[in-house]
Swiss-Prot record:
Region spans: Interaction with the F-box domain of F-box proteins: 115-173
Keyword Nucleus: yes
Gene from which the chain derives: SKP1
Recorded metabolic or biological pathway in which this protein acts: Protein modification; protein ubiquitination
Gene3D superfamilies (alphabetical): Potassium Channel Kv1.1, Chain A
InterPro entries to which the protein is assigned, alphabetical: SKP1 (IPR016897), SKP1-like (IPR001232), SKP1-like_dim_sf (IPR036296), SKP1/BTB/POZ_sf (IPR011333), Skp1_comp_dimer (IPR016072), Skp1_comp_POZ (IPR016073)
Subcellular locations according to the entry: Nucleus
GO molecular function terms listed in the Swiss-Prot or TrEMBL record: cullin family protein binding
A single GO BP: protein ubiquitination
SUPFAM superfamilies documented for this protein: POZ domain, Skp1 dimerisation domain-like
Name recorded for this polypeptide: SKP1-like protein 1
Entry-linked PANTHER family: SKP1
């Protein structure tokens, strides 16, 4: 057990063999890792065969930011508990939204790898953020624009495409 004031550290091992020492609270943002810690499977490090070191470092950066922002917000709320200002959300909420927006300004391959990692590690906030980013990339675009954005080849014949448009006319209105 970690001594008073000392933070317990967890070792995460990426698919390419790199090891990351992270605070237990940060690692527990992942429900997958949380269950491993709760089941006492974290003593020799936690192998993450589906996440490479580049993506794992980004995931840790996200979890770190969110854990410390939540702690700061809780601390601020405790300080303000006696005053009417307690009902007002801490200013860090807007800062965190801006940080999140900057965090997902990455190339498509990294974004998709972050989605896969967030899903595998069961980090709801990160999965929601990354999926919403992809949804925003699609919103308001024609099928042709979406194909171009994501480099998707159109393998429909003109006849098949027309049939799909006819069957799904409601979606194109």
């Amino acid at each position: 057990m970690a001594a008073e004031g000392e933070k317990k550290m967890i070792t995460l091992k990426s698919s390419d063999g790199e090891e990351f020492e992270v605070e237990e609270a940060v690692a527990m943002e992942s429900q997958t890792i949380r269950h491993m810690i709760e089941d006492d499977c974290a003593d020799n490090g936690i192998p993450l065969p589906n996440v490479n070191s580049k993506i794992l470092s980004k995931v840790i950066e996200y979890c770190n930011k969110h854990v410390h922002a939540a702690a700061a917000a809780a601390s601020k709320a405790a300080d303000d508990a006696a005053s009417a200002a307690a009902a007002v959300p801490p200013p860090s909420g807007e800062d965190l939204k801006n940080w999140d927006a900057d965090f997902v300004k990455v190339d498509q391959a990294t974004l998709f790898d972050l989605i896969l990692a967030a899903n595998y590690l069961n980090i709801k906030g990160l999965l929601d953020l990354t999926c919403q980013t992809v949804a925003d990339m699609i919103k308001g675009k024609t099928p042709e624009e979406i194909r171009k954005t994501f480099n998707i080849k159109n393998d429909f014949t003109p006849e098949e495409e027309e049939e799909i448009r006819r069957e799904n006319q409601w979606a194109f209105e």
